[in-house]
Amino acid sequence: MKSATCRLANFLGCFFLVLSSCVSGIALAADAEQWGVWETSLDGPREGDPYLEVQLSAVFSRDGKRIQVPGFYDGEGVYKVRFSPPAPGQWRYETRSNRPELNGKGGSFTAGPAAADNHGPVEVFKTFYLRYADGTPYHQFGTTCYAWIHQTKELQQQTLRTLAVSPFNKIRFCVFPKAYTYNQNEPELFAFHKEAEGKFDFDRPDPAFWRHFEQRILDLQRLGIEADLILWHPYDRWGFADMSDPQDDRYLRYCIARLSAYRNVWWSLANEFDFMTDRPKNHRGNKQMDDWDRFFQILQKEDPHGRLRGIHNGRVWYDHTRDWVTHASLQTSNMAGGVGYRAQYQKPVIYDECRYEGDIPQGWGNLTPREMTQRFWLGTMSGCYVGHGETYKHPQDILWWSKGGVLHGESPQRIRWLRDVMAQAPSFDELQPLGDDQGRYLLAKPGEYYLLYSPDSRPQSVDLAGDRPYKVDLVDPWEMAALPLGTAQPGEYTVRPAKSDLAYRFTPYAPGEKLRPEAKISASPTEGVPPLTVTFRSETDAAAAWDFGDGATSAQNPATHTFEQPGFYTVTLRVTGRDGGSAVNQVQIAVDRNTDEPIVRAAYAEGETPALTMKGTAKRGPDGIIQLPDGQPWGWVKAGDGVLEDLRGLRSFTIIGSVKPDSLEIGSGGNRILFCLNKDHSGIDLVCHPDGRLRLAVNQWPDRIRNDSSPGKLVVGKWTRFAVTYDATKAADNVRWHFSRPQDVPEAAAVALDRKTTYNVGPVAGDIGPLAIGNFNETMHASGLDRQFRGQIRCLQIFGSRASGRGAMSLEEIGKR
């Protein structure tokens, strides 16, 4: 793996490399290294339209191998042919053209051996994997900067400096500029000539742009980074997405002729290809499904260097089983599906877009750093490759995902650490993904290496082959730490994670190697409210050292510690034997918030939390009542500024409130009383249906679930008090619905149990959306606001617990609120 220091040194040396190339000129043009670029320039016709009228290619031959390479027009009467020799030795060439002054030109050149840092192009290996042409392993850790080459020169240089010290060895970016949210700047250069009146001539490439583009590909190559070139996309205001079929084909062939000789080039036919066909709002394109097939066939047949070929999806997935697709380039957040995607496509699978780390309102751009890191682990453990992106708000809209610049997030350093972990393991192509699509993640070379990942805290088992004991290491992806956990005997071994997001590494002891001591912990109690005093005991005689996870430590055994603040604390015990060997173990202590205090208190005359902002037609009534009139343009209530942290990860919760519908007419799927899903997943959604029943969805879109109250509980023109509880610690009857009788005035009324339902999808996920009352939040506004609750809401409260079932209140507790 190329180090960041080495990358930076290479980048700083680029100027001198370019300078020496210019000085040596003809000498360098006459020779090349294996997998480098050899180029010849020819003088030809200037008159007419060379791009449309002149055909040029050359046949390169060596030892009976013949390769036909297309040429291209570079402006000012200059024609070029570029070739990347796949083998060292003497190569001969002869040009072919429909113009006599370009036809029959020939000669020879010598390709030398590849330089030490030139491993050749990346290619598919053993069905599911990637490697360099010289056999060097290549484990893709990608990132995305869609429009970085369309920014100022200063910003492009800053992006290169950032990449030089990053963990990324592939970057996805577009040939054409992008017109989209946070992307409104006008580039200096375009792929085609811009006429005086502002229109583009799609039959006349601009050589200045292409020379600039090539330089950026070479800049990346010197940093050891693959350039995944996106040829089309639907985010366009200049017309590039709507070129004619002949113009599209000529453009593609021009890209092949100019760019395929660079060994770090990959082809991505499109970003969200299907959005150029069905054209959702603010998307452009005139492509049909047959067009994408044709483009792939052109690449497959006419790219003389056989670069990798993929296509990125929006909602519709391309058929990646087709033989002209070399790898499956996916946009999906289904990280559990990796093993299945490999089996389905029988090709390398790359999660090129699994959402981005950031803080923008859009659901695709607000992963936490921990979630971005976790997705890299989940994809890797499934035998797949993963891509990164970053979308933190910036006063000048310089978001890495599109414009580059600098990285602000916390996931890149952890992605680097994962890359180091994998570099220390057997080669990726030797590791089998032995997990499934149900939450089991195991990567193994049986008998030699096992890496078991636990995204949650459920116990998991692994069957260790052979007759030697194994060293067990506790691997913490977020803390970037690998700790000696102890010893596992061959056979079935069960891990019991102290917290979520941990991995366990198993490697056999060498013959004669001393076994580690055992670290065993007992702790009581393990959960409660602050101040919580816990007694810890090490169950071995070895010297004990405790780290309580809140900055406090102890060398006593037993040890007692008091936790003063709510939180989840990972307590670590390290034991050291007389021979100096050590091992660790961990236990998690859950110190819960006071569940008697509401997380949300809304639609009150005073004492609300968090602060509420009325949006659209939403307004206040007497005593803080929220009024949501029936009819366009609709309204909603914003609760707080961004995601409410205390709603993340709730294992149990209670929602209490009073509602008075003015109408039970609904938008598609039902009207929202409260909504904190992140688009269509992760969070809580409480929905009103036209027959007066409510539905609760957790972490999923509600349309296909059946977790409902009885019908007829809400009545038009009447106030009804309700309470719904959810308890993920219970296997059955974990949801309880309570309602009062409908009444004319908004007074406190006793509720009674309506029904119990079994609906358990686990705790509320961590990557929730912001809370909205009475309608969708910002992550779903693009789908319309007619899902507004049509009426009034009063005294709405949410209580919850991350640690236990205490957040699901009893009927008696509800009656006190």
Which residue stretches match the model-derived regions?
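Extracellular/lumenal mature domains of secreted and surface-exposed proteins
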Residues: 31-75, 94-111, 513-596
